[in-house]
Amino acid sequence: MTTVFQTMPTFLAGLNIANFGAATSQFPKLESEITAPRQSMSTAFQKMPTFTSVISVPSIAAIAPQMPSVKPEKGVIGQCLICGEPSTGKHYGIVACLGCKTFFRRAVVQRQDTECKREKPCDVTTMARKACRACRYRKCLESGMSKEALQPRRDLIGCRRIRSRPSCSTSTPTPPRPQVEDKSQYLTLLENLTTIDDRLRKKKLEVVASRQAAVDLAVLAKQGCMSITDTSGPSTSRYVPGGTSPNGGDHKMMVMLGTDISVSTQSELLMMLEWTRTLPVFASLPVQDRSVILKRFAVHCLILEHGYYTAQANIDDVWLITNGTCMPRNVEKLEEGCKISVSADRRWRQEKLYKQMTDCCIDEVATPLRNLKLSPQEIVVIKIIVLFNCGCSSDYSEITEASRRIVLTFRNKVVSALFAYYESVGLQNYAERFGNLVLMLSGVSSAASSMLEAYQVMRLFKITPFDPLSQELLFNI
C-alpha cells in the first residue's frame, strides 16, 4: 500500500492537473496513518482529499457552447380540413393530412364506389374517418380537393425510370421477328402431320369395317343365309361409318363384348405403331427409348382415338369404339332392341366392373372433346403432346437425356405450328383455346388409368382375349 501511494504523485504529475501541489503534500501524512492500527483506517479515509479538490472539472457552461445546435422539428401548419388531424402541408389544393391525401388519390384513380349506405351524413373525424368511404370522399370534394391536381400518369407503385433508347445510327439491329418462311414451314409441317393422321384413321376404319363384315358373313353362313342383301344389314348394325352419327332407322346400337374390345384394341395399336414411324424424330431415337414411350402412350392412344370417335358420333351417355359398339352409362336407358340383346352376365359386368371406367371416359374425355369440337389439326397436336410426354419426364430414368431433349424440342415445334395455324385461319383468343386443350389432358390421364385397370380385370378373368402385341404394349407382358 505504501508503494502505491508513493508512486501516485508521479502518475498525477503526468496529467498536469490543477491543485496538484495541495494534493501531493498530504501523501506523507496519509502514509503514516495507513501504517497505524486498523481502528484508525476510517480516520485516514476521512482525511483524504476529495476528487474534486484534486482534479478540476470544467463547468457545463463552458462545454455547452461547443455542442452543435439541434434544429427543432418543423411544426404543423394547421389541422386537416377533412378529419382534423395535424397537417404539415397542402395536398391537392387544401391543407390535408397524408392519410386523407392518399385516400383521395386512390378513390380517384381506382374509381371506387362513392355511395353512402346510410341516410344521414357520417362523421368524418380522426377516429371515425375510415367508417364511410363515401362520406369521406364527399367531404374531400366539399373541402376543396381537386381531381385536376392529380397526376394521372403517375404509376401506383412509384415512378419508373424510362431508359433512353439509343439513336438509330448507333444502335445495333434488333433480332428479327419470325419470317414468313418460318411460318410457312410450320404450316407445312402441321399439314403433313394432319394428312398422315387422317389417312391412317380412314384406313383403320376400313379395316375395322372389313373385319366386322367378315364376322357377320361367318355368322350368316352358320345360319345358312348367304345372300348379299342379308349380309349388309348386320354390318351396319354395329359399325358407324366415318365416326358420324347414324341417321338411318335400321341402325341398332350394340353393347361391346370381349371380342369387340380385343379386335378394336389390336387395330388401334397397329395404327399407332404405323403413325409413330411417320413422325420425323421418332425413328432417330434409340430402340429402348422408343419402347418405353410406346408402352406408356398405348392406353392414352386408345382413349384419344375412342374419345374422338365418340365425340364425332354425337351420342350421349355412351362410350364408343371404332367398330360401332358401345359401353353405356346405364344399360336400362338403351333402346329396347339393344337392351334385349344384352345378357344378364354382361349387364352385371357393365354395372359392377366397367361402370367407373365408362363414367370417367364419358365425362372426362368424350364430353369435353364434343364441346371443344376439335379440328383434325388439333387432335394430331394433342396426340403428339401426349406421346412425347409419356416417358420423357425426368421421373423416368429409362429415357436418356439426349432423347428427352429431342422429343421436347419437336413437341414445342409442333405447338408453334398449331399457333401459326390459328393465326392463319384468323382464330380469336387462340391462346385461351389452347389452354382449354391442355386442361383436358388431365382428364385423358384419369380416363387412361381407369381403362387400364378395367382391361387388367378383363385379362385376369379371361373376359377379353388380348393378342400378344396388345399385352406387351398395355400390360408390359
Swiss-Prot record:
Q: Where are the zinc-finger regions (NR C4-type) in this chain?
A: 80-100, 116-140
What's the chief localization of this chain? nucleus
* SUPFAM superfamilies recorded: Glucocorticoid receptor-like (DNA-binding domain) (SSF57716), Nuclear receptor ligand-binding domain (SSF48508)
Q: Does the keyword Secreted apply?
A: no
One Pfam family per UniProt: zf-C4
Report the GO molecular function annotations: DNA-binding transcription factor activity; RNA polymerase II cis-regulatory region sequence-specific DNA binding; zinc ion binding
One GO cellular component term noted in the UniProt record for this chain: nucleus
Q: Does the keyword DNA-binding apply?
A: yes
Q: Where is the NR LBD domain?
A: 216-477
Q: Where in the cell is it found?
A: Nucleus
Q: Which UniProt keywords apply?
A: DNA-binding, Metal-binding, Nucleus, Receptor, Transcription, Transcription regulation, Zinc, Zinc-finger
Its biological purpose is as follows: Orphan nuclear receptor.
Name of the protein in question: Nuclear hormone receptor family member nhr-19
Give the organism's phylogenetic lineage: Eukaryota, Metazoa, Ecdysozoa, Nematoda, Chromadorea
From the UniProt record, report the name of the gene that encodes this protein: nhr-19
